[in-house]
Swiss-Prot record:
Pfam families from the UniProt entry: Ribosomal_L23 (PF00276)
Protein family according to the UniProt entry: Belongs to the universal ribosomal protein uL23 family.
Keywords from the UniProt entry: Ribonucleoprotein, Ribosomal protein, RNA-binding, rRNA-binding
Gene, per the UniProt record: rplW
Source organism (scientific name): Lachnospira eligens (strain ATCC 27750 / DSM 3376 / VPI C15-48 / C15-B4) (Eubacterium eligens)
Highest taxon above the source species: Bacteria
Annotated GO CC locations: ribonucleoprotein complex; ribosome
GO BP, sorted A to Z: translation
Name of the protein in its database record: Large ribosomal subunit protein uL23
Quaternary data: Part of the 50S ribosomal subunit. Contacts protein L29, and trigger factor when it is bound to the ribosome.
GO molecular function term, any single one: structural constituent of ribosome
Role this protein plays: One of the early assembly proteins it binds 23S rRNA. One of the proteins that surrounds the polypeptide exit tunnel on the outside of the ribosome. Forms the main docking site for trigger factor binding to the ribosome.
Keyword flag Transmembrane helix: no
Length: 99
């Protein structure tokens, strides 16, 4: 995990009903690199989005889904999800504006 830069940590935002409801409390949900830890996620959010201050980070590992194609069975890749709580005086994240 030595060569992962901050822009490689956050892969994409998670846009669901629950994550949209949490945005009112300044909680934002992202899919992150599977090897990223909480401090790396905090640093990446603060560097990528100017004016944001992270209060806490909650992470969860998600197993891959079972898929079939004919007789062949397999699984999709594992993913990691992070819920980032911003401080009260922090700016909003612009990527979620207008959703």
């Amino acid at each position: 995990m030595a060569n992962v830069q901050y822009y490689d940590v956050i892969l994409k935002p998670v846009i669901t009903e629950k994550s949209m409801a949490d945005m009112a409390d300044k909680k934002y949900t992202f899919l992150v690199h599977t090897d990223a830890n909480k401090t790396m996620i905090k640093d990446a959010v603060e560097k990528m989005f100017e004016g944001t201050k992270v209060a806490s980070v909650n992470t969860m590992n998600l197993d891959g889904k079972k898929k079939r194609r004919g007789r062949t069975a397999g699984t999709t890749s594992k993913t990691k999800k992070a819920i980032v709580q911003l401080t009260a005086d922090s700016k909003e994240i612009e990527i979620f504006e207008g959703l």
